Swiss-Prot record:
Binding site for GTP: 32-39, 98-102, 152-155
GO cellular component: cytosol; ribonucleoprotein complex
Residue span(s) of domain tr-type G: 23-264
Residues bearing PTM Diphthamide: H605
Primary location class: cytoplasm
Lineage summary: Archaea, Thermoproteota, Thermoprotei, Thermoproteales, Thermoproteaceae
Gene: fusA
Gene3D superfamilies: 3.30.230.10, 3.30.70.240, Elongation Factor G (Translational Gtpase), domain 3 (3.30.70.870), P-loop containing nucleotide triphosphate hydrolases (3.40.50.300), Translation factors (2.40.30.10)
UniProt cross-references to PROSITE patterns, sorted A to Z: G_TR_2
Pfam families recorded: EFG_C (PF00679), EFG_III (PF14492), EFG_IV (PF03764), GTP_EFTU (PF00009), GTP_EFTU_D2 (PF03144)
Protein name: Elongation factor 2
Superkingdom as given in the UniProt entry: Archaea
Keyword set, alphabetical order: Cytoplasm, Elongation factor, GTP-binding, Nucleotide-binding, Protein biosynthesis
Family under the similarity heading: Belongs to the TRAFAC class translation factor GTPase superfamily. Classic translation factor GTPase family. EF-G/EF-2 subfamily.
């Protein structure tokens, strides 16, 4: 990439001049289903900026800068690049992010969307709108990111499917219709109509990233080009001419400039969605305007480990101007750090810049403690609310155990794993303090495969990886009786019951409409109006676990010294819900209610070592008396298959406890939507391929948690307990507390 660095340094003065004018900045990125051609499309854009030679664009995969990405021909991380482009006689700076399409890497997409105002959605003309297209469009719309459409691989319609010009036109209209249906379904109400793509207005482009051409309807009309001319170009061998006349980079960058809003426009509607502070305050106004002279506020979207520079935080400057040497405060971590260097990105290369104003994407060295999702501010603003937490669509549901072949390498391995989890918060790391066992959880098997590959590359150590295990959740199916938890010294008594948390409240936690640090009155009002909560109970919430969707409520009145032990009770609640009594799996959807308490007057007799076990034991007893069960993760499958093979595919799904949710048929293709337990998914790929003689496309992504069928529940609990070295029989409430 050295040529890229030279080009950029030549342009650096021009880039900094534009960076000060928000009207000439666009923050956009590619979004797509896996293999629909995002990275090849991004490479065309690099060619346009003079960063790749035209010969290699389309197959260089320059944005896939991790070696395994080029090896597997797929993107697993999100890469940033700043492009300089002239349009209508004006220079523009387009900050561009290439994101992964595979379902296992949606976490990288979530983080990238925070810095984008527009998403270039790439759709394969043959496969059309797929599950992951739906997921990324939905994620984009939740972050108020405007989507525009590029229908890629038109060459496949001509060369593989041999469609006539009329059929190609029909295929494109179908994709536009399906795409607009997603916008209708997921867009914020005020943008449902405004953001639907209108091909006649140039909001949709079509072309071939591989052959480097792209065209919009207005461009085609102006040049007098018809679908029959495009078919001719392929049949008569003058595709290169098409690429010269309508270079893809020019078409796409023009579409982005015309239809993706500049930051000072986008922030007017994005900030009220992303930030809960006072919009009429000085900082509120600066954020809405993307004011480079306002106080500094940066949203961190990702953190990467650099072998020489340490941790590099990348984010978007929403207000103010960040300079080398500035002091910055990390909200939530309550610490000040000094920015040692500021950069912009060119694929894997970082280019040092003296400053970066509002509306731009910047990389910072020196803020080692910052994490994806953090808010960095001018130290004088340490009291302002941070940006909304990022909402990850997929959860880590597959786990592997990692063991170094040489025990002396353990510390180095653990250190490198901690760095991986910082870079990718959708990974989950657990180290058993007693046994030293290392457990790494990810969204899917591919996610873990890539993580362990990176681990090997970075540490150069040998280690073994166990076969994948599924992560489960524990929950309850009814309300328990009240149970008494006694502290070990018998001087404190706490009384709890548990019950299932209703789905509406779980959704309010998931969408962050209610949060732990929210004003209790505001939270109580939302719970009363949207989930039918009792007013007193809603005001009594002490803690919300937004990772596994549990909460604890205080329903006591007038208990002496309760306030002094509140934090210890909350810690005991978190301890209990992290690993439940059935099989030490995390609890999900649990409402814990404290009804009464007797607290010792002497602080020496009511410390954490007394209160936490009393809380945990009472919660465990309550859970075991409330018809506990195991929840298993289900995957959603989108299948496209030749109609002749529907029967064979259905029988494969039935064999694996799969359930068909929906089926539609067109002349060439049947479309099936199904659900399948992750537990049953490991061999399904080969079986589906064999059943349909290879004539099948499908994609899988996390769907939901569902109770395990009663017929296999007892066996599964025994298996899980055995694997964890626990006694096989399920404990009784009286194993944790005295009968009450």
């Amino acid at each position: 990439m050295s040529s890229a660095v030279r080009v950029v340094e030549k342009q650096l003065d021009e880039i900094l001049a534009i960076a000060r004018n928000p009207a000439q900045i666009r923050n956009a990125g590619t979004l797509a289903h896996v293999d629909h051609g995002k990275t090849t499309t991004s490479d065309s854009l690099l060619m346009g900026a003079g960063l790749l030679s035209p010969k290699v664009a389309g197959k260089a995969l320059a944005m896939d800068y991790v070696p395994i990405e080029q090896l597997r021909q797929m993107t697993v991380k999100a890469a940033n690049i700043s492009l300089y482009f002239e349009y209508g006689g004006k220079p523009y700076l387009i900050n561009f992010v290439d994101t992964p399409g595979h379902v296992d890497f949606t976490g990288h997409v979530t983080r990238s969307l925070r810095v984008m105002d527009g998403g270039l959605v790439v759709v394969d003309a043959v496969e059309g709108v797929m599950t992951q297209t739906e997921t990324v469009v939905r994620q984009a719309l939740e972050e108020y990111v405007r989507p525009v459409l590029f229908i890629n691989k038109i060459d496949r319609l001509i060369k593989e499917l041999r469609l006539s010009p009329q059929e190609i036109q029909q295929r494109i209209l179908t994709i536009v219709k399906d795409f607009n249906a997603l916008i209708d379904m997921f867009a914020p109400p005020e943008f449902k109509d405004k953001w639907k793509v209108d091909p006649g207005k140039g909001q949709m482009a079509m072309g071939s990233a591989l052959h480097k051409w792209g065209i919009t309807i207005p461009m085609a009309q102006k040049a007098g080009i018809k679908f029959s001319n495009i078919v001719d170009a392929y049949e008569k061998g003058y595709v290169d001419q098409l690429a010269q006349e309508f270079p893809l980079y020019k078409t796409l960058l023009t579409m982005i400039i015309e239809h993706v809003p500049p930051p000072n426009v986008a922030q007017k509607y994005r900030i009220p969605r992303l930030w809960r502070g006072d919009l009429n305050s000085e900082i509120g106004k600066a954020l809405l305007e993307a004011d480079p002279n306002g106080p500094t506020v940066i949203a961190v979207s990702k953190v990467n480990k650099d072998p020489h520079a340490g941790l590099i935080a990348t984010g978007r400057v929403f207000s103010g101007t960040i300079r080398e040497g500035d002091e910055i405060y990390i909200i939530g971590r309550k610490m000040k750090k000094k920015v040692l260097q500021t950069y912009i990105y060119m694929g894997p290369s970082r280019i040092i810049v003296p400053y970066m104003p509002a509306g731009n994407i910047v990389a910072l060295m020196g803020v080692d403690e910052a994490r994806a999702g953090d808010t960095l501010v001018d130290p004088r603003l340490s009291e302002i609310p941070p940006f909304e937490k990022m909402r990850y669509i997929s959860e880590p549901v597959v786990t592997v155990a990692i063991e170094p072949k040489n025990p002396a390498e353990l510390a180095r391995l653990v250190e490198a794993l901690k760095d991986l989890v910082i870079e990718d918060p959708t990974l989950d790391l657990k180290i058993d303090q007693e046994t030293g066992q290392i457990l790494l959880s990810g969204v899917g098997t591919l996610h873990l495969e890539i993580a362990t590959w990176l681990l090997k590359e970075r540490t150069k150590t040998e280690f073994t990886v166990s076969p994948p295990l599924i992560r489960f959740r524990e929950t309850v199916r009814e309300r328990s009786q009240v149970w008494e938890g006694k502290s070990p010294n018998k001087h404190n008594r706490l009384y709890f019951y548990v019950e299932p948390l209703d789905e509406t409240t779980i959704e309010l936690i998931a969408t962050r409409e209610i949060t732990e640090d929210q004003d209790p009155r505001e939270r109580a009002k939302i719970l009363r109006e949207k989930a039918g909560w009792d007013a007193d109970e809603a005001r009594g919430i002490w803690a919300i676990d937004d990772r596994f969707f549990n909460l604890i409520v205080d329903r006591t009145s007038g208990i002496q010294y309760l306030r002094e032990i509140r934090d210890y009770i909350v810690q005991g609640f978190r301890w209990a819900t992290e690993a439940g009594p059935l099989a030490q799996e995390p609890m999900r959807g649990l409402k814990v209610v404290l009804t009464d308490a007797v607290v010792h007057e002497d602080p020496a007799h009511r410390g954490p070592a007394q209160i936490m076990p009393a809380t945990k034991n009472a919660i465990f007893a309550a859970v075991l008396s409330a018809r506990p069960t195991i929840l298993e993760p289900l995957m959603k499958l989108d299948i496209k298959v030749a109609p002749d093979y529907i029967g064979a595919v259905t029988s494969v799904l039935n064999k694996h406890r799969g359930k068909i949710l929906d089926m539609t048929q067109q002349e060439y293709m049947a479309y099936l939507r199904a659900e399948l337990p992750v537990l049953e998914s490991f061999t399904i790929s080969d079986e589906l391929r064999a059943a349909a003689a290879g004539k099948i496309f499908w994609s899988m992504q996390f769907s939901r948690w569902a109770p395990m069928p009663e017929s296999i529940l007892a066996d599964m609990v025994k298996q899980l307990r055995k694997k964890k070295g626990l006694k096989e029989e399920i404990p009784k409430p009286t194993d944790f507390v005295e009968a009450f």
